[in-house]
C-alpha cells in the first residue's frame, strides 16, 4: 500500500492543510487521514462503506484506490445534495454509487436516514458508515440505530462543543467547524 502518493496541499493549517488531493480530486482531510483509513480498511476489511457527504469526491476515490490495492471487494454508496460534473465519470469507472439527494427520509431530518441507506447498512458483512454531511450529530444518531454487531460508525470534523474545538482542535488538527 503506497500512502505517499496521496499529497497534502498547503504547508500549514493556515494555508489549507486540511485539503489534500487524490488523483486530482480534493478531499477535506488532514494529513493523518490516509494512513488511518487505509489501516482501517486493511484490518477490518468491510463489505461496504456508506458515506454521508461526498463533498468533492476525493475521499470516495481514496476508499476505492485503497480497496483495490489491498484486493478488497468493497461497495461504496455516497450521498450528497450537490452533484459535481466529474461524479458521472467516477461512477462510470465504478468508484462508487453517487446518490445526489438527501440522506434523510423524504428529505426531512427528523424522519431519520432513508430506507435505502438502512437496507444498505443491514446487508450481510461489516458496514462502515462515515458521517460527514451537514448534520453529523443527527447522521450519527440516526445511522447508529441500524448498525449490526461489528459495524463501524465514524463522524468527521466533529467536536462536542466550541470550547473543545477552540482549545484542542482549531489550528492543531483542522481549522474549520
Predicted regions and their residues:
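A short alpha-helical cap/connector motif
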Residues: 1-177
Amino acid at each position: 500500500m503506497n500512502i505517499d502518493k496521496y499529497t497534502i496541499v498547503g504547508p500549514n493549517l493556515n494555508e489549507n492543510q486540511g485539503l489534500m488531493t487524490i488523483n486530482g480530486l480534493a478531499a477535506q482531510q488532514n494529513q493523518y487521514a490516509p494512513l488511518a483509513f487505509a489501516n482501517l480498511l486493511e484490518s477490518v476489511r468491510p463489505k461496504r462503506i456508506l458515506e454521508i457527504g461526498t463533498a468533492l469526491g476525493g475521499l470516495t476515490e481514496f476508499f476505492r484506490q485503497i480497496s483495490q490495492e489491498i484486493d478488497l471487494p468493497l461497495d461504496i454508496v455516497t450521498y450528497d445534495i450537490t452533484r459535481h460534473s466529474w461524479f458521472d465519470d467516477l461512477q462510470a469507472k465504478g468508484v462508487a454509487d453517487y446518490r445526489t439527494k438527501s440522506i434523510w427520509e423524504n428529505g426531512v431530518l427528523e424522519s431519520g436516514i432513508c430506507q435505502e441507506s438502512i437496507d444498505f447498512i443491514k446487508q450481510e458483512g461489516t458496514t462502515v458508515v462515515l458521517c460527514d454531511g451537514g448534520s453529523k450529530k443527527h447522521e450519527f444518531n440516526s445511522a447508529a440505530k441500524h448498525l449490526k454487531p461489528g459495524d463501524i460508525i465514524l463522524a468527521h470534523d466533529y467536536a462536542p462543543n466550541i470550547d473543545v474545538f477552540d482549545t484542542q482542535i482549531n489550528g492543531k488538527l483542522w481549522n474549520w467547524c
